[in-house]
């Protein structure tokens, strides 16, 4: 199916690109989320008339994401979890825990934005975590997991 991208889609293309994708991907994901439209002649003409407006909107979204990333970059986030004597946690620190800690500090992030390269954190110490705010913008923070002794 031929579609017009209404925003940048990772591994697919930029705003305004006409690309061919599988029917299911277009019908079930891209079109319902507003990331694409069917590439009919009428849709292409409508897109071209609104192109400048859409590009400005995307630029504003990118600028807002860069501003949020500048605030988040290098942040040291502390999370306390029960741990044994050897520094191994009872349970783990997941992206939901990191989301809650960031919201407590006043940052609005969604759980799906948090990328943990080694999976959930199961050891006391400092761990690098990436927050992907936009397809082009990522902020790197350090999550410091503190062990809480169990009596």
UniProtKB/Swiss-Prot annotation:
CC per GO annotation: ribonucleoprotein complex; ribosome
Any GO molecular function: structural constituent of ribosome
Record Pfam families: Ribosomal_L9_C, Ribosomal_L9_N
Keyword Iron-sulfur listed: no
Annotated keywords: Ribonucleoprotein, Ribosomal protein, RNA-binding, rRNA-binding
GO BP, one annotated term: translation
PANTHER family per UniProt: 50S RIBOSOMAL PROTEIN L9
NCBIfam families per the UniProt record, alphabetical: L9
Function: Binds to the 23S rRNA.
Family to which this protein belongs: Belongs to the bacterial ribosomal protein bL9 family.
The name this protein goes by in its record: Large ribosomal subunit protein bL9
Organism in which the protein naturally occurs: Nitrosospira multiformis (strain ATCC 25196 / NCIMB 11849 / C 71)
Gene: rplI
